[in-house]
């Protein structure tokens, strides 16, 4: 698999998106290391083989829980990679979705898939570091991220950035794992394939996320630990939902 055929086009799109959305932060392509085309290809192949059943149910739950079906505006998937969740969200919402990922080598594949499904006009991509998001304050109507936050070196800073970018009244849904509507049989099969590498202390993670919210002064938040019937032996993951308060309405009559 080669992702570089349309990379020039993708970079131009990234730069255009960046020019529209921010002016004070510069884009820099990552230098070598783990953010490579080879890494992107490996993740895409792994996702196809293992995680493909996860995204449809997750998108379905997100749209239902946050009433996104008729909502318009901007949605951001932070750390979206190949953008499979965005494709599923495009099928169910009217939002324009932005794939914000630190590895731009995903973007050619992402655009190809979006165009294949008829959503090329409803998506954008931009290289983004969670610790310094390239968006204006109060920019996004919804921010989601699956399977990324545990890689962030400074989680307090990253979650603070997400909060900054949310519009007043908007919500973020950040986590790892599955949605409660994913059949237990499928979840069990995925965990069995993943083995020990996806074992983590959910209780410890919940405490960590709660501490981050308190440090940032975010009061309107909720930690979800999906536990559908029959899933007692399956780790369904953990999700953090938090809201940015709406702007206060000034009573000019007073």
Where is each model-derived feature located?
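Short alpha-helix
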Residues: 200-217
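A short glycine-rich, Lys/Arg-flanked "PGG" loop and its adjoining helix->strand segment in the class I
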Residues: 156-168
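N-terminal, positively charged/glycine-rich alpha-helical extensions of SAM-dependent methyltransferases
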Residues: 20-42
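Class I SAM-dependent methyltransferase SAM/SAH-binding core
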Residues: 74-78, 82-132
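A short SAM/SAH-binding and catalytic strip from SAM-dependent methyltransferases
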Residues: 142-154
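Conserved class I S-adenosyl-L-methionine
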Residues: 173-197
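Conserved alpha-helix/loop element of class I SAM-dependent methyltransferases that forms part
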Residues: 52-72
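A short acidic, Gly/Pro-enriched loop at the edge of an enzyme's catalytic core
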Residues: 131-142
């Amino acid at each position: 698999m080669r992702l570089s055929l349309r990379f020039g086009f993708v970079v131009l799109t990234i730069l255009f998106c960046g020019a529209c959305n921010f002016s004070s932060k510069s884009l820099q392509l990552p230098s070598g290391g783990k953010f490579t085309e080879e890494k992107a290809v490996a993740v895409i192949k792994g996702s196809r083989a293992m995680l493909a059943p996860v995204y449809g149910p997750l998108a379905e739950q997100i749209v239902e829980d946050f009433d996104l079906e008729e909502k318009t505006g901007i949605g951001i998937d932070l750390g979206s990679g190949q953008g499979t969740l965005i494709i599923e969200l495009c099928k169910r919402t009217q939002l324009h979705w932005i794939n914000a990922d630190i590895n731009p080598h995903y973007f050619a594949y992402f655009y190809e898939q979006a165009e294949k499904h008829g959503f090329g006009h409803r998506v954008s991509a931009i290289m983004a570091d969670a610790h310094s998001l390239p968006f204006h304050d109060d920019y996004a109507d919804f921010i989601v991220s699956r399977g990324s936050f545990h890689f962030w070196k400074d989680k307090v800073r990253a979650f603070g950035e997400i909060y900054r970018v949310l519009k007043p009244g908007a919500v973020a849904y950040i986590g790892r794992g599955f949605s409660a509507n994913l059949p237990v049989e499928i979840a069990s099969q995925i965990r069995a394939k993943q083995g020990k590498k996806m074992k983590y202390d959910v209780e410890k993670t919940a405490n960590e996320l709660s501490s981050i919210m308190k440090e940032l002064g975010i009061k309107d938040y909720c930690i979800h630990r999906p536990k559908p019937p029959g899933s007692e032996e399956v780790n369904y993951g953990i999700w953090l939902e938090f809201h940015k308060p709406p702007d206060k309405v000034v009573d000019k009559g007073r």
